[in-house]
Amino acid sequence: MAGAEPFLADGNQELFPCEVCGRRFAADVLERHGPICKKLFNRKRKPFSSLKQRLQGTDIPTVKKTPQSKSPPVRKSNWRQQHEDFINAIRSAKQCMLAIKEGRPLPPPPPPSLNPDYIQRPYCMRRFNESAAERHTNFCKDQSSRRVFNPAQTAAKLASRAQGRAQMGPKKEPTVTSAVGALLQNRVLVATNEVPTKSGLAMDPASGAKLRQGFSKSSKKD
């Protein structure tokens, strides 16, 4: 306030200008006005909306502006690569038709072309478009975690199996006791002696000839 030029108002009262708003106040009033005026001017004011002011006191709701959705960037089509793939496919088809007519073996197919718009997955190394790649990622990650090959762990399993087989030793063949062997021999002898007989016929165990019941084989008379 020292540098401010005083102003004599009516009644010979000196008024001093405010450094912020430029209005003039008495010395005692300016001391109270200064801090308040600085706070008001330093505060960020919201932008004034005349639409809200006009709609106040009415039943019309305020219209919220929908944010404009950003359109995804259009990818450049790789027409040159597609044209070359098309020409290679036609040439390969002509070579196959010519080989069939001449009876020669079919030529190898052209190498597969890589679509630059497809995304390669790090787990299976296959390529998908963007939407399919997002769906496939979790499934492929789960499958690859199940099929992790650990050479050290596999070698340890094989070694433990071989050691267990060596400790078991060779399989012993089943042995037949003497009592069981004698029983089997008796059954064989009984089976050979017992022959089914027909009406009135019997089998001679010595010669194997059939005899009538009640008669025995006699020697021929001289």
Swiss-Prot record:
Sorted keywords for this record are: Metal-binding, Repeat, Zinc, Zinc-finger
Query: What highest taxon heads this organism's lineage?
Result: Eukaryota
InterPro entries reported in the protein's UniProt record? ZC2HC1A/B-like (IPR026319), Znf_C2HC_C3H (IPR049899)
User: Do the record's keywords include Zinc?
Assistant: yes
Q: Where are the zinc fingers (C2HC/C3H-type)?
A: 14-43, 117-146
Q: Cofactors per UniProt?
A: Zn(2+)
Sites where the protein binds Zn(2+): 18, 21, 33, 37
Any GO molecular function? zinc ion binding
Region of interest (Disordered), ranges: 48-78, 196-222
UniProt keyword annotation of Repeat present = yes
Query: What does the sequence similarity comment in the record state about its family?
Result: Belongs to the ZC2HC1 family.
Q: What is this protein called?
A: Zinc finger C2HC domain-containing protein 1B
Organism for this UniProt entry: Homo sapiens
